Amino acid sequence: MKVIFLQDVKGQGKKGEVKDLSEGYVRNFLLPKKLVKEATDSNVKTLDAQKRSEDKRKEQEKLDAQELGKKLEELTVKVTGKAGEGGRLFGAISSKQVAQALEDQYKIKVDKRKLEMDAIRALGVTQIKVKLHNEVTVTLKVHVVEE
């Protein structure tokens, strides 16, 4: 019996997959637990439409990330911190502070977890990586100045 998986089933298939399974297993176990549905023509067409819309949504997310990445590469974020002799900071500049400064200065919201950086401990310009999407990583300049 052909079925469409509604959820991942260990050892059988992944969500959205169409597979031929034994009728008893499907009727007695998978259907009552709503893990699968029968692969009728209308259900298969619905699944294809869902896959197409999901692909379109993912492509749009990637394009949005690339557009934001172009903006970020041109910017320099200015962050202030207290410093001692030799340009060493008291404490450090964290990803949270950089994300907040980016939002305050340029009205661009970026999640602090997308900033791939170690804590900044010195004055000057530092380049950090920003992972906006699985396939889109850009470099952002952070200029740390003394208060």
From Swiss-Prot:
Membrane-crossing residue ranges in chain numbering: none
One Pfam family of this chain: Ribosomal_L9_C
Molecular functions (GO terms): rRNA binding; structural constituent of ribosome
GO biological process: translation
InterPro entries, sorted: Ribosomal_bL9, Ribosomal_bL9/RNase_H1_N, Ribosomal_bL9_bac/chp, Ribosomal_bL9_C, Ribosomal_bL9_C_sf, Ribosomal_bL9_N, Ribosomal_bL9_N_sf
Keywords of this entry: Ribonucleoprotein, Ribosomal protein, RNA-binding, rRNA-binding
Domain of life, per lineage: Bacteria
GO cellular component: ribonucleoprotein complex; ribosome
Region (Disordered): 44-63
Biased composition, class Basic and acidic residues, residue ranges: 48-63
Family according to the record: Belongs to the bacterial ribosomal protein bL9 family.
Entry-linked NCBIfam families: L9 (TIGR00158)
Function text: Binds to the 23S rRNA.
Name recorded for this polypeptide: Large ribosomal subunit protein bL9
Source organism per UniProt: Brevibacillus brevis (strain 47 / JCM 6285 / NBRC 100599)
